[in-house]
Swiss-Prot record:
This protein's encoding gene: cyp3
Source organism of the structure: Emericella nidulans (strain FGSC A4 / ATCC 38163 / CBS 112.46 / NRRL 194 / M139) (Aspergillus nidulans)
BP term (GO), one: protein folding
One Pfam short name: Pro_isomerase
Protein name, per record: Peptidyl-prolyl cis-trans isomerase H
Any one GO molecular function term: cyclosporin A binding
Transmembrane segments: none
Entry annotated with the keyword Nucleus: yes
SUPFAM superfamilies: Cyclophilin-like
SS bond list: none
Gene Ontology CC terms: cytoplasm; intracellular membrane-bounded organelle; nucleus
Key words of the record: Isomerase, Nucleus, Rotamase
Length: 183
């Protein structure tokens, strides 16, 4: 595993493209399209992709994933965080690999611009279902969080979420992924 990074690659046609349809306070904001860097971070990208499509099943055999989950943490000029469909508050963790967490895949890509998709974690090798999207360059996260995708359409939606009113970094109105899947 390398801590040195390279610039984010251009969109690669073989990489999966997923989407989130997002609502704020019950009102639709629009669609985010995300490229997953399966060519650089295949395990991390696949974990996220299956939570977008609902292919992953819980212990009861029901689909589990991002549909209906919230962006529970929003910090202006930093990032928007979501993906905790377990508890909804940033404490839950789940993977497609049958464990609550999985290891950091690599730190090849850097947090060098807005619109990057990266794993939220609670320390080394604690990746699960939570993710964040950067709203600025965040180089202090390099070597700590795995970059595994980028926003390819809908950065205006990210900015709307970033600018929503919050109390202690929690949006005052629910920011919900009302639909998601693979393009």
């Amino acid at each position: 595993m390398s801590n040195t990074g390279s610039a984010v690659p251009q969109t690669t046609s073989s990489n999966p493209i997923v989407f989130f349809d997002v609502a704020l306070g019950g009102e639709p904001l629009g669609r985010l399209k995300l490229e997953l860097f399966a060519d650089v971070t295949p395990r991390t990208a696949e974990n996220f992709r299956q939570f977008c499509t609902g292919e992953s099943k819980n212990q009861q055999g029901r689909p589990q994933g991002y549909k209906g989950s919230k962006f529970h943490r929003v910090i202006k000029d930093f990032m928007i965080q979501g993906g905790d469909f377990v508890n909804g508050d940033g404490t839950g963790s789940c993977t497609i690999y049958g464990t609550p967490k999985f290891s950091d895949e690599n730190f090849t890509l850097r947090h060098d611009r807005p619109g990057l998709l990266s794993m939220a974690n609670s320390g080394p090798n604690t990746n699960g279902c939570q993710f964040f999207i950067t709203t600025t360059a965040t180089p202090f996260l390099n070597g700590k969080h795995v970059v595994f995708g980028q926003v390819i359409d809908g950065m205006d939606i990210v900015r709307m979420i970033e600018n929503t009113r919050t109390t202690r970094d929690k949006p005052n109105q629910d920011v919900v992924i009302i639909q998601c899947g693979e393009m």
